[in-house]
Amino acid sequence: VVPAEEVRPFLIGFKTMKELITALAALDEARVAVWHVSFGSGRFLRLNEEAAGLTTTAWQGPALLLAPLQSEATAVEQFISARLAALGGEVLPTPQAQHAWEERYYPMRLKRLGPSLIPSESVIPLSGLEAALEELTATFGELAMEGALIKGQHVAIQSFALGDERLPLHFALDFTKSLQVMDIAFKHGGFPYSLGMFFTALAPSKFGEGLYQELKNVKHALDPSDLFNPDKSLASKNRTLAVAMSAARLGRPLAEATAAVLPKIRQGERPLPPGLADDAFACVQCGYCRPVCSLYAGRGWESATPRGKFYFLREYAHGNIDFDQAEVDTFLMCTTCKRCNPECQVSIPIQEDFDQMRGFLVMEKEFATYPAFYMMKAATRAEHNIWAELREHRADWVPEDITYKDAGPLAYWAGCTASYVIPDIAQNAFRIFKEGGLEFAYMGTDENCCGAPMFMSGRWDAFEEIVRYNIDQFQKRGIKTLMVSCPGCWVFLNHYHRDWAKKLGLEYDVEVRHVSEVIADLIGGNRLQFKRLPDRRATWHDPCHIGRHGGIYEQPRQVLQSLPGLELVEMTHNREHGLCCGSVLTRIKEPVPTSDRIATLRLDEAAAAGADLIYTTCPCCEFQFRVAGDSIGHPMRTIDFTNAVVEALGYEGRDTTQASLDIWVVFDKVIKQMSVEGIAQMMRDLMPEMLANMPEFMNKSMGVMKSLPEGMRETMLGAMRPLIPKMMPAMMPGIMPKVLPDILRYMEEQIPGIPPAMRQLMPQLLPVVMDDMMPKMLPHVLPLVVDDIIKGMADSLKGANKVQ
């Protein structure tokens, strides 16, 4: 243990491993103070950089990594110049050294290139290292290998061979190479890095007979039944494993010959989106992603984690399991928080992979998306917003004293939620721009949705339409820079629109800036003059979509810290480690308990930080914290940060919490009504109307049955029961238009307080929603109502007018 101090890494390249080993000996002899000493073969270094997505270095030979403490770096630098250069060492560029240092604990990154690895670990005396490496090179060619110096006398060697477990026979045969590497290490005085289950027979020689017996005695005294780590490290009663190890060694020559002629056939692999199968098999199942997974925090099930999903995809690719709607729902519920990406030991682009699954599952595999998204899709196509509001009212929020242009290089994007639900976000932005002297454009009623709900829901057909429309509008209006309040809009206009523009062959060169960046610039240019606010202590919640997706962490903090009277305190998890709010996907799919649990973690953190309120900038985060707080009775308030800015500018801020709660009451009822259970209950309640509008052939059949004796009717109805789930999907397209007025009346009865615009649009939107949704919903709904249908038919035959 030493006092905390930064290190300064040096990477020294050599032409041959022999030169590098000589340098190691010189380093030991000179007793130079170096905190960390390791090395890698040329192949290891190149593969490591390739796995990280870096441009592979031109250096082909092995390299030595020296990482002294900063206070001792000058002496090490002098040693490199005086001694190692004379031995053929060449100092490689600093960025390459920094990468090698930062990646020193992540050799498993190579697995992405496999997507499987065959590792071998051993410890070799420094005196025998040269001969051992020469034999390894003669046997295998250039190995991907790294080593670390242990007390100057031994070197821990870890070698890697790339493999592919999707070729099971090849993979099994290739694994014998790891034993061959180990045997060469033993030959030159080495021993296993760890014993585990495979090398327990070597325990006496590794520990020494005296220590070995002492360890066995202690283990037996503490664990007489050998319950803990049985058959590991000290002794093994597993004779089968010992026999298998011997057989593997004896059969190695045959394995090598077999592998050379065996065709490489992947068994039963089913297609996945590009790159996803490789990533699923590259996942090492380490579980580092699990503690940071937002969905896991709310659900508590392994299936919610990236590790669980990659395991499922691996089994799916093998043909051992298939998707069902429940599993699809789990994939779609990923919050896109991106907390897992930096934790992945293999650098898998997890969030981007699960993005690809959305379109794959909904568009290609034709599973249902969440019911709410069907209404959003219909509303967006009809009125350019997800809230089923009228397009003509999109700009009603604009303050009367603010003027703007219809076109120009600098423009503002409000987004659907700020335009219709919590307008303080957009109104504040306009007032700040005015005070800062900005001239800008706003598209008004021509502004569309950013497309986030369509992309997240897997409805990529609708998302493509939105991308094309938006880019066309930007070009027509000469927009070069777009100022955006909503982080969801920011990431979709900045990242996803850019990616899709390339796919669609569209030109898209618009710079997208978050309003916090714009306000920070105005403050930095002394263009905003603030008054003192009433004293308050606030914390900042980092929205995922401008944080981990965009790296915008400091600008909103700079804005808040510039406001007199406001004390900013940090939550335990902040910036790149900030917790996700859980919205929107968990809120519309599993509001209780999943979504509430995720939000509670953040609300509790804010309270623990001593904050009076949370400031943030995301309408979805604000909506989530407000609704969850109301659900669980949490007192923490959440306010858009621009309210603090306009207050300091002399305007009155607004708390739109109640507006969020009011719209959620309606939206929650709509979601429940459109769920499988909600549709089933609607069919039960409207059974007389549905039966009265059956196709003609069913009416004739019912007429025939009505003339039969009661016993025969019951027999025929019983025979029809298994046919109903097969017949109804074909009959529903004819029934639905006839009962639409009844459905509209029913919806208004079940959803009191429905906004006037939504009520006005329902006759237009509902048929579209039902046509889109019902074919995918009916297979799940009909098993719940088949008994009700049979009972309704029986009552109808008896002349009943109403289904009880």
Task: Map each language-model feature to its residues.
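Activity-critical C-terminal alpha-helical subdomain
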Residues: 199-263
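Acidic, glycine-rich loop-and-beta core segments that form the ion-binding/anion-interacting portion
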Residues: 31-67, 75-84, 466-521, 527-528
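Peripheral docking tails and interdomain loops at the edges
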Residues: 222, 228-229, 233-242, 520-521, ...
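Cofactor-cradling patches in redox/metallo enzymes
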Residues: 347, 417-510, 545-562, 567-675
